[in-house]
From Swiss-Prot:
Family: Belongs to the vasopressin/oxytocin family.
GO molecular-function terms, A-Z: neurohypophyseal hormone activity
Source organism: Catostomus commersonii
Lineage, top ranks: Eukaryota, Metazoa, Chordata, Craniata, Vertebrata
Residue(s) carrying Glycine amide: 29
Keyword vocabulary terms for this entry: Amidation, Cleavage on pair of basic residues, Disulfide bond, Hormone, Signal
Protein name (database record): Isotocin-neurophysin IT 2
Cross-referenced PANTHER family: ISOTOCIN, NEUROPHYSIN
């Protein structure tokens, strides 16, 4: 009987140790201490630092779209080592995400299509760039057109 009691106590001890914070960027004072710190804007990333980090491997920005797991997102991994939490731009969407690009909602885990990110602030995503993108696409027309 004493062997089973020591096994139970060992299991309870392991459970108490396992309830520790597993996230590499847990703040001093535990998870609840985050509520006391003011949020800041997330780090810039991507080509020319035109984007903002939305997660450890997610970089989104105006006219850039979203980059996932590319070399441009490596800087976003540094965000895990900063003591204060950050808040990416855009309005709230999804479960805990924010609008990252037109029609795209991102959180720290990934991105998904979201209609609530299409409507609303047209200036937040640079609508004037749409004309430039269309002009850019028209320049890539096939050079050998058949004339009838």
């Amino acid at each position: 009987m004493s062997g089973s009691m020591s096994s139970v106590f060992s299991l309870l001890y392991l459970l108490s140790v396992c309830s520790a914070c597993y996230i590499s960027n847990c703040p001093i004072g535990g998870k609840r201490a985050v509520q006391d710190l003011p949020s800041r804007q997330c780090m810039s990333c991507g080509p020319g630092d035109r984007g903002r980090c939305f997660g450890p491997s997610i970089c989104c920005g105006e006219g850039l779209g979203c980059l996932l797991g590319s070399p441009e997102t490596l800087r976003c991994q540094e965000e895990d080592f900063l003591p204060s939490p950050c808040e990416a731009g855009g309005k709230m969407c999804g479960y805990e995400g924010r609008c990252a690009a037109p029609g795209v909602c991102c959180d720290s885990e990934g991105c998904s299509m979201d209609q609530s990110c299409v409507n609303g602030d047209a200036t937040a995503f640079g609508q004037p760039d749409l004309l430039l993108k269309l002009l850019h696409l028209s320049n890539h027309a096939h050079p050998y057109r058949l004339h009838q």
